[in-house]
């Protein structure tokens, strides 16, 4: 009979969690079945990212219950492991002897080959419209003609592919899935930008105001509020409401993965959006401007101002006019001629992606598009004597551009649900400032949710 996915996931889960304190230097693990069938896996253990690729590339016969031969027995459906440390090229390598217990495999010669990736899960990951990724879950989906299963628990994300393919091809698919998940779980998705931290110890009640500190890595500011009731809890409860969460259904998630995997410009745009979350504030705008350019290249359209035959006649007339201009020397004439090209201006090409998904841009958003070249060449980065005001200005512009790109991508994959409204930010700040310490949690929570919608 076929491999039981849930049993495999349970085994991987037990194995990883049993050795969650493995040193970060480990970069390779060899897994050996007791029947001499070898399963090789390359692990990269890093401080913030856990990744592994299990390649089950051998036919595995039906197994019976196996007696423990190595190490300690962890659970009924788990691995039995013995650690043998080695040194190789200045890197610490561990060899694991493993018995896979109570798991059945196909006995036929046409036994399927499975690829499995293990990744560290985001702390507050939400996936698809009806699944919160904090419980043991097996999700099946398809993209680019391949069937995938996702297993999720409190800290791990395990992705299994049923389709037979080379390990390098499998890693390309995993990279696309991981990029899609990273995009969906940035802190600006699901209105997390509206979650504030309550610091009740350092302020008196009469200091009840909003204090903006340096921006964190996700483009939002930590906002500390001085109140004499647990406002943070009320905010968190309010923000967990279903109506203000971005949740993709399976078809939308499949389209997102497919576009990332199959379109280089779309993938580049997502890449720079994600990279912007790690950059210094002044550099965030530069990363997002590159993503904006990739969007323009992704949204194919007419590249010429006029038909080529019409432009050829027009160019001939202009060249003649330039040749007869006595005020210009030969070098200047040549420069002017080369400047006249049959190409749509950059300002129009940058707007085109948003027009194609019927996004109506505000004056602030249009102004950001006009400043794109200045931002990219750093001429828009100005510094005054007021560092905080500079930070607020860059943060606001970055947030506007980020959410423009975010909304474009969501609309491109057919998402029709809730999308963050950038104009809500100023409303939220004003809303919180209007409340005082006599406001009850229940009233605050109810009004706060209304403010967000």
Summary of predicted features, one role per range:
Residues 171-252:
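Internal, Lys/Arg-enriched amphipathic helical interaction segments that engage polyanionic partners
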Residues 10, 37-38, 63-64, 137, ...:
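Residue-identity detector for threonine
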Residues 157, 208-211, 289:
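A broad, low-specificity signal marking well-ordered, structured residues that form hydrophobic/aromatic
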